[in-house]
């Protein structure tokens, strides 16, 4: 099981590739790709299908034996984006000695220092000419070799570096791409990489969404190989747990939904984010296809339950003072239910009890997380989604260290626990 997760992480350096890989895995397991531009048609019990939005979010459905109005739906949601650096247009910056660095902007909230002095690569999508102006073609790019690096300033020029350094997002985190060898490469070094990798012509390239990614493969470590080290555990590990559970669960009375959104790290307010009405539209279309009445959708929502799956903070042995004294989850302790008095999480006593029951039925331990009262925490998908679909639900996630680092640390057994809990949820 863990090898499949590591392979998925390595093959999914950005949201677009994560959605591609999830799509292919679903298709291999009997799910049919549907075009949301076309009518759904008749919806049969047991039918399995998925749709995508913007090539960066994906929504999978296994239709229950009972109509949505009668049995509701069980939904797991997660997000496939992670903090990184986006390549700006006109990105090449020529420096002395022919060195070319790339102009970038920060995406989300990365721990920027963790991106220094490690091999990086490029991944994303490239838009090329299509049949007409309104239908350009999308090509996915993943340079599968070390290509760039952000280098630190030597300690000899900054003796206070170990006392803390304030980093400029515009100046200090620009990656080195290469050295120009001849005049023809001037201004074309990045474009040459793109066209060579995709075997296309420069004049066909219209635009791109490209991002930096860690070029080092995901791995396990520890005396017993009990830990996972990888970029993007937040939140691809939860995405993949949802995929594994959706594939493993057989059809039952309740419709099963897996929603993997984009842009959680920047607020979710996009057409492919949790703040979009797209998922609501899809559920309404399914309900209407089954019962031909709008009332069916509203009944389904009242019978539904959502698991919002986004990683939680594991207790850190070097920084124990940052954690709540009685609610600090450990690596290897099972899925974590997240609470917040300011309602940043969807969890309440009822939904938490339901999720704890699910874990118990799956033979899985679970933990609880509350922020230290003097330390502000983040928010996640649950309440954003609930603002458009008023679902009963719980915010949870597996505990990890170094959230938003270029490489995060998780637990092997926690991933196995999570897949078991998610599978049991879909089977109820």
Q: For each predicted feature, which ranges?
A:
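N-terminal hydrophobic/helix-forming segments and targeting peptides
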Residues: 1-428
């Amino acid at each position: 099981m863990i090898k499949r997760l590591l392979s998925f992480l390595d093959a999914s350096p950005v949201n677009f590739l994560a959605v591609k890989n999830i799509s292919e895995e679903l298709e291999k397991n009997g799910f049919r790709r549907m075009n949301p531009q076309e009518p759904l048609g008749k919806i049969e019990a047991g039918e399995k299908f998925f749709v995508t939005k913007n090539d960066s979010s994906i929504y999978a459905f296994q239709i229950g034996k009972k109509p949505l109005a009668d049995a509701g739906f069980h939904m797991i949601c997660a997000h496939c984006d992670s903090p990184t650096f986006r390549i700006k247009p006109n990105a090449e910056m020529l420096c002395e000695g022919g060195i070319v660095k790339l102009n970038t902007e920060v995406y989300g909230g990365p721990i920027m220092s963790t991106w220094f002095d490690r091999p990086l690569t490029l991944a994303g999508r490239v838009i090329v000419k299509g049949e007409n102006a309104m239908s350009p073609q999308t090509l996915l790019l993943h340079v599968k070799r070390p290509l760039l690096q952000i280098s630190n300033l030597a300690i000899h020029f900054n003796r206070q570096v170990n006392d803390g350094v304030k980093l400029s997002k515009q100046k200090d985190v620009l990656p080195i791409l290469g050295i120009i060898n001849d005049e023809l490469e001037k201004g074309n070094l990045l474009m040459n990489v793109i066209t060579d990798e995709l075997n296309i012509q420069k004049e066909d390239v219209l635009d791109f969404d490209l991002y930096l990614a860690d070029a080092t493969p995901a791995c396990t470590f520890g005396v017993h190989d009990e830990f996972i080290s990888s970029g993007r555990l937040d939140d691809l590990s939860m995405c993949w747990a949802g995929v594994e559970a959706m594939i493993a669960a057989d059809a039952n009375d309740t419709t099963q939904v897996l929603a993997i959104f984009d842009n959680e790290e920047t607020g979710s307010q996009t057409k492919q984010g949790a703040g979009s009405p797209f998922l609501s539209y899809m559920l309404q279309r399914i309900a209407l296809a089954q019962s031909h009445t709008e009332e069916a959708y509203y009944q389904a929502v009242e019978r539904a339950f959502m698991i919002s799956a986004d990683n939680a903070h594991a207790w850190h042995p070097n920084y124990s003072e940052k954690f709540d004294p009685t609610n600090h989850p450990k690596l290897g302790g099972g899925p974590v239910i997240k609470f917040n008095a300011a309602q940043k999480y969807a969890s309440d006593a009822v939904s938490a009890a339901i999720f704890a029951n699910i874990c118990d039925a799956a033979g899985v331990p679970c933990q609880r997380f509350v922020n230290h009262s003097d330390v502000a925490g983040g928010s996640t998908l649950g309440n954003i989604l609930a603002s458009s679909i008023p679902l009963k639900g719980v915010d949870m996630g597996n505990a990890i260290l170094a959230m938003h680092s270029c490489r995060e640390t998780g637990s092997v057994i926690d991933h196995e626990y999570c897949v078991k809990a998610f599978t049991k949820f879909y089977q109820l």
